[in-house]
Amino acid sequence: MVADVKSPAGLAAFNTTLAEQAFATGFVLSGEDAQLFAALGSAPNASTYPNVARWYANVASYTDAERKTWASAGGSAPAAAAADGDDFDLFGSDDEEEDAEKAKIVEERLAAYAEKKAKKAGPIAKSSVILDVKPWDDETDLGEMEKLVRSIEMDGLVWGGAKLIPIGYGIKKLQIITVIEDLKVSVDDLIEKITGDFEDHVQSVDIVAFNKI
């Protein structure tokens, strides 16, 4: 993990790290991502640090409350804050004398508690996906192929780092990371769009890894 993202050298090192993985410690969001996000403060220059810029946009899509729940690498998520109001006394004061009155108070407070919990929006389900995009032959312009893949824009889709990997006979494949919101983006639809829209460049697309975040 990069300790100092405020220096150009540290930011460049983090950009290199994100070319190989989606997040600070791998392919799952962690407390380190939240710390680096806070330390960075604002999105970096996308031309100079494209991988960090994409990572920043993804982390920024979460709320502060959600980022506080991310566990540090090898650790556990922090306990929920008491400020949520979940710790109020359901059973009222010890000075209550009538059982009926106590029961009424408990019932009212339980109803209010249940209503409050029901109104809380749950965390957005996201997944980190690594795709192998294979060209037809060694004459395919892989730079152009990557640009075409990244040109696909969907609500809930964020492209991450990418690299070229030799597969034999002078042919290389494009391996690219993407983070998707599960309710908004279908990986099958994304693959179909890549192979359908860019069939002159793309022979096939395979899923290398699929991890829930």
Swiss-Prot record:
This protein's UniProt keywords: Elongation factor, Protein biosynthesis
GO cellular component: cytosol; eukaryotic translation elongation factor 1 complex
Record carries keyword Zinc-finger: no
Transmembrane feature ranges: none
Annotated PROSITE patterns: EF1BD_1 (PS00824), EF1BD_2 (PS00825)
Annotated GO MF terms: guanyl-nucleotide exchange factor activity; translation elongation factor activity
Gene3D superfamilies: 3.30.70.60
Tagged with keyword Protein biosynthesis: yes
Gene Ontology biological process terms in this record: translational elongation
Subunit structure: EF-1 is composed of 4 subunits: alpha, beta, delta, and gamma.
Function: EF-1-beta and EF-1-delta stimulate the exchange of GDP bound to EF-1-alpha to GTP.
Protein family per UniProt: Belongs to the EF-1-beta/EF-1-delta family.
Protein name listed in UniProt: Probable elongation factor 1-beta/1-delta 1
Organism: Caenorhabditis elegans
Gene responsible for this protein: eef-1B.1
